[in-house]
């Protein structure tokens, strides 16, 4: 596998040399211009059903941390919205900045948030996540912005596991967590056709970006930044600025579920 990261030598502007699709027609993230998004009355409300017992573990993969879910049944799913069929939750992860003025991957009229949550789902018309990931309608990712405010009690349960996964390659069991507790109260969203935001940058994602952010405190953001890109025994390198900047829209349309 090609090494990639977020530094000056292996960061997003260098990915194209190993992953030429980085310059493709439907890359993510994007800057969402609310005025340029068209309201589509045909977009249904999102239907999310998550089973906390599907939650398996939390791990530091050296690019972010992710919480993984058992995806061998239809007990944690995303339906409706802009998609057809049933998509199963595979994992969720975050992207964040070194300071509170940056960190999200999507931006809204140029506004950056300090972090962004991604809930990754795969289309069950394909036999596995791995196969779905290369299909144009294979994945659906729900993106949620984090905005500085009150401490987020649901998020705190995730952050409390960080002591066990500080370094790259570490993982620990993480059970009975309901990811729906991380969703905003209002599920109005923008949607567009895009890609994974990390290599291999496959153009297989229906993006569903929630309009309403969830809260995170400054202290909680500091906890995100205590994770390490580096493995144990290596020089410590704080995990910050693990986001890809917005990519060209290239004629794509962004639709809104709300007026």
Curated annotation (Swiss-Prot):
Residues 2-258 form the Alpha-carbonic anhydrase domain. Belongs to the alpha-carbonic anhydrase family. GO terms for molecular function: carbonate dehydratase activity; zinc ion binding. It comes from the Eukaryota. The keyword Acetylation applies. It catalyses: hydrogencarbonate + H(+) = CO2 + H2O. One of its GO terms (biological process) is regulation of pH. Zn(2+) binds at residues 93, 95, 118. Catalyzes the reversible hydration of carbon dioxide. This is Carbonic anhydrase 1. One of its GO terms (cellular component) is cytoplasm. The lineage of its organism: Eukaryota, Metazoa, Chordata, Craniata, Vertebrata. Substrate binds at residues 197-198. The keyword Ubl conjugation does not apply. Its cofactor is Zn(2+). The active site is at residue 63. The gene is ca1. SMART domains: Carb_anhydrase. Pfam families: Carb_anhydrase. Keywords: Acetylation, Cytoplasm, Lyase, Metal-binding, Zinc. It is found in: Cytoplasm. Its EC number is 4.2.1.1. The modification N-acetylalanine is found at residue 1.
